[in-house]
Swiss-Prot record:
It comes from Daboia siamensis. Expressed by the venom gland. GO terms for molecular function: serine-type endopeptidase inhibitor activity. Belongs to the venom Kunitz-type family. Serine protease inhibitor that inhibits trypsin. Residues 1-11 form the BPTI/Kunitz inhibitor domain. The keyword Glycosyltransferase does not apply. It comes from the Eukaryota. GO terms for cellular component: extracellular region. Its main location: secreted. It is found in: Secreted. Keywords: Disulfide bond, Protease inhibitor, Secreted, Serine protease inhibitor. This is Kunitz-type serine protease inhibitor C10.
Length: 11
């Protein structure tokens, strides 16, 4: 999980 790629991942 990369916080720089702001996608809806559910983390």
């Amino acid at each position: 999980y990369n916080p720089a790629s702001n996608q809806c991942q559910g983390f």
